[in-house]
Every structure is written in C-alpha cells, then in structure tokens.
Amino acid sequence: LLLLLLLLLLLLLLRLPLLLLLLLLLLFESVDYKNILHWTPPINDTSLQYYVQWKIYGEPQWLDVDGCQGIEKHHCDLSGVTSDPREWYYARVHASSKPASKSAWTLSPRFSPRWDTKISPPVLKLNITEQGIVVRVKPPRPLVRKMHNDLFYKIYLVHNSGAEEEFEMECCFHKLNLKKVKHKEEYCLQAETVIAFQAKSSDRSPEKCVTTL
C-alpha cells in the first residue's frame, strides 16, 4: 500500500497519466478448460484500452491474442491459445490511452491448464421405472470435447438410513440402472466428474431425491 501511494505521488508530481501504474493483478480463472485471464485496472481507467499477449513457458517470443488488442473490458479468453494441457503458459497485459501513453507490461502467474483448471460437477437426470432408478449424466460440453476419453463419473446413492453406495459410469452416453432398490422408498443421488490420469475430480453435484414406485 505504501509503495502504491508513493507511485501515485510520483505520477502526480511528474504530471503523467495514472495509467502508467502497473495493473494491480492478473489472474487466470479456468473452469472445464475454458481459460479466462482477468485483471484489475489502474485506479482511473477511463478511456483505457488493453493489449494482451501470451507465450509458452520457456519460449522467448510473445504473441498477440486475437480479439484482445485495444479492448476496454478487463478480461480475455485465452482458451484457444492455451489449449495444450501438457504446457505451461504466461500472459501479460498493458494499458494505453490517447494520445499514445502506455503502461508497462504486467505479467501473469505461470498457468497450467492441466493442473489449474477446475472441473464442474455433472448434471443428473433421473427416471423412475418399475425396475428401479435410471441414472443419466450430462457433463459440461467443453470438458467432454477436451477430455472425453479420460472421463468417468462417480454416482452416490444415499439410502433413507444414511448409508451410501458408490457406482461408476463411463463417459459419455451410457446410463446406469439401479435395480437393487426398495419399492416406495426415497433415495438421494449425487455425481462427480473424474479425470482419471490427472487424479482430478469435481465437487459433487447438487443432491437430487426421488421416490421409487
């Protein structure tokens, strides 16, 4: 905070635009491999435009992000250029205002799609039949497109007594038939998405309860 105040004072003394302050924070937010870079703007960002670049960790060359040059918003979708889960990436942002004043570049933390993305829980669809409960799972589409060969689901069946059973389903178009259930009994179910080779899983989905026939 003291350093920030000193920088503000220096800018005022030199009569330079406030945009020359470094951006305060760059942060990747990644859900289901949709990788969005967010940044906190300078204190006075009126009429500022932002320019975003990216590179692979270890590579010398910075590349412009298409669609994120001269933008006024405070975020940029880098999913297309940070799509390889085996790589690590950096991004950087600088601000510009008319007539041509520019801030210094601000660097993001190093980012890994594989390790930093969060996995969304799937959506459960339940049907009741004379034979029991039919469970279908709808995963997030971006995750299926990216990782469908490595996905599976854990299904949790909770009995009235509180006892819990666990089942597994493969991705992505299968259904699970739960036949060993009692008639006219309430059961609650949850599911989570698992990426096996990464040992990564989502939170459990919201609980859905049904009563058998």
Predicted segment positions?
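Extracellular fibronectin type III
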Residues: 98-118, 196-213
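Membrane-proximal extracellular "stem/stalk" segments
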Residues: 149, 159-213
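Proline-enriched interdomain boundary motifs that mark the N-terminal boundary
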Residues: 21-27, 117-126
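Beta-strand-rich modules
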Residues: 76-102, 176-201
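Structural signature of extracellular immunoglobulin-like
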Residues: 38-42, 50-55, 89-98, 136-142, ...
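Conserved aromatic anchor
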Residues: 33-45, 78, 131-148
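N-terminal Sec-dependent signal peptide, specifically the hydrophobic helical h-region
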Residues: 1-26, 47, 51
